[in-house]
A protein has these predicted regions:
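Cytosolic regulatory regions built on CNB/CRP/Popeye-like sensor folds
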Residues: 1-152
C-alpha cells in the first residue's frame, strides 16, 4: 500500500485537496517503524516533532500513573503540544503493537506549501480544542462525584 493510500482517510488530511495529499505523500519525510513496547515519545524530552500514526495503536502514559491517559489508533496525531509550543514532552507514547508513524519536524514542515501548513495548524487547533472539551467534561464528572466528600 502506498503512503498516499495510507493517508487518504486520515482526519489530518480532511481539508487537503487530492493533489495536496499526493504531493505530501511524495515528499521526502520520515516514515518510522516501531515495535511493540517501543517508546515513541518520552516524557521530559526536548524534541519538537509531530507524529501521525498511520498503522497500529499506542498508549499515552504519564510518569507516576499506572493507568494510560489515552489510546491512540491509526489516524491519531500526537506530539502537538511540543511541536506548537517548544515545551518538553508532557507524556510518554508507547507502541501497543508494531506501528508506522510519519514524523513531521520543523524542517519538513517548512518545506510544505503554505496552504498545507495552514491546514495542519488549523487541524491541530481543532484537535486541541476537542481534547480540552473532553478534559473539561471529565473534570466535571469527577467534581460531581467528589461533592459531598470531605477533603482532608
Amino acid at each position: 500500500m502506498s503512503l498516499y493510500e495510507m493517508i487518504g482517510d486520515i482526519p489530518l488530511f480532511k481539508n487537503f485537496s487530492e493533489e495536496d495529499k499526493k504531493a505530501f505523500a511524495k515528499m521526502d519525510h520520515s516514515v518510522l517503524a516501531f515495535s511493540k513496547g517501543d517508546a515513541i515519545i518520552k516524557e521530559g524530552e526536548n524534541y519538537t516533532s509531530l507524529f501521525l500514526l498511520i498503522r497500529g495503536s499506542a498508549q499515552v502514559t504519564r510518569k507516576g500513573y499506572d493507568t494510560p491517559v489515552a489510546l491512540l489508533k491509526a489516524g491519531s496525531v500526537f506530539g502537538e503540544i511540543s511541536f506548537l509550543t517548544r515545551r518538553a514532552r508532557q507524556s510518554n507514547v508507547i507502541a501497543n503493537e508494531n506501528i508506522l508513524a510519519i514524523k513531521i519536524d520543523d524542517s519538513f514542515f517548512a518545506k510544505l506549501e503554505p496552504a498545507m501548513r495552514d491546514n495542519i495548524k488549523n487541524y491541530l487547533i481543532e484537535l486541541l480544542a476537542n481534547r480540552l472539551d473532553s478534559m473539561n467534561e471529565a473534570l466535571s464528572k469527577i467534581a460531581k462525584y467528589a461533592r459531598g466528600y470531605a477533603v482532608l
